[in-house]
Design a protein with these regions (language model features):
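Conserved inter-motif catalytic segment of the P-loop NTP-binding fold
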Residues: 7-10, 20, 26-27, 31-33, ...
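Pre-Walker A (Motif I) flank of P-loop NTPase domains
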Residues: 38-42, 78
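Hydrophobic positions on the alpha1 helix immediately C-terminal to the Walker A/P-loop
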Residues: 55, 59
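Gly/Ala-rich phosphate-binding loop of Rossmann-like dinucleotide-binding domains
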Residues: 64
Length: 247
């Protein structure tokens, strides 16, 4: 029996195993330290109308014009992919980006006229590489899960986010997802995200956007970090929304 067992083991295909000593260490690169890392997936969430999309647009604008993000160093301008399924490109997205000062030649989007985009679509990685994109925004999450995907089922959500995370890692692109919170009251915002808790578990950073209700005269919003798997959490950052966009 022992000989037979050895013979079977010899015929089996070896399992690919690596030694940790063979892994070359790398340093995390940041688009906005410590909020948004390059090569990873970040989630921006909050209740409807609190400024999630405005914040995402402002970040996209800063990336295209090289201006300084709050508490961050100036960056060299680069191309951005902005995918949205909730607002009109011509009447909403472009005017808002303009208010934020975006360089429109650097803001791109994948044309979905013939085929709707999903997280597993191979056009994502191709578009990132072909356009030298370093930031991709998808707004909102549920619009890009794909047909017949139940976002409340962990076994259906995990492969999608694993695939998206792999794209981010291979290309070095920061992928930012916009998510709404559900209507549950009294529960932690981490667990009020739409869908499976695996969504929050799969991303490396979670930013939460909220409106400061006490500030009646000024439209003040605050973004703070709920999760950071890569660095120490930063203090909340306040911004305002007005006729000139985000400040």
């Amino acid at each position: 029996m022992a000989k037979q067992m050895c013979w079977r083991d010899a015929r089996e295909k070896p399992v690919p195993v690596m030694k940790m000593s063979e892994v070359e260490e790398t340093v995390v690169q940041w688009l906005w330290d410590p909020f948004i890392p390059f090569g990873k997936v970040t989630l921006i969430q909050g209740n409807p109308g609190k400024g999630k999309t405005w914040l995402a647009m402002a970040i996209a604008a800063y990336c295209t014009n090289g201006k300084e993000l709050p508490n961050a160093l100036p960056i060299e301008p680069f191309n951005v992919l902005y995918q949205t399924a909730e607002d009109g490109i011509a009447d909403t997205i472009k005017p808002r980006l303009a208010k934020c000062g975006a360089d429109m030649t650097r803001v791109r989007f994948i044309n979905e006229d013939e085929k709707q985009l999903s997280m597993t679509d191979d056009r994502i990685e191709k578009a990132i590489r072909q356009n030298n994109v370093r930031l991709m925004i998808m707004d909102p999450i549920q619009a890009y899960l794909g047909a017949n995907v139940d976002m409340n089922r962990a076994n259906e959500i995990r492969p999608l986010f694993r695939h998206l995370s792999t794209i981010a890692e291979r290309t070095g692109c920061a992928i930012v997802l916009i998510g709404h919170l559900n209507k549950s009251s009294g529960s932690q915002s981490d667990y009020r995200s739409l869908g499976s808790i695996d969504i929050a578990a799969a991303v490396r950073s979670i930013l939460f956007v909220e409106k400061v209700e006490k500030e009646k005269e000024q439209d003040i919003r605050v973004v703070y970090q709920q999760k950071d798997s890569l660095a120490k959490k930063e203090n909340p950052v306040a911004f305002s929304l007005g006729e000139e966009g985000l400040k």
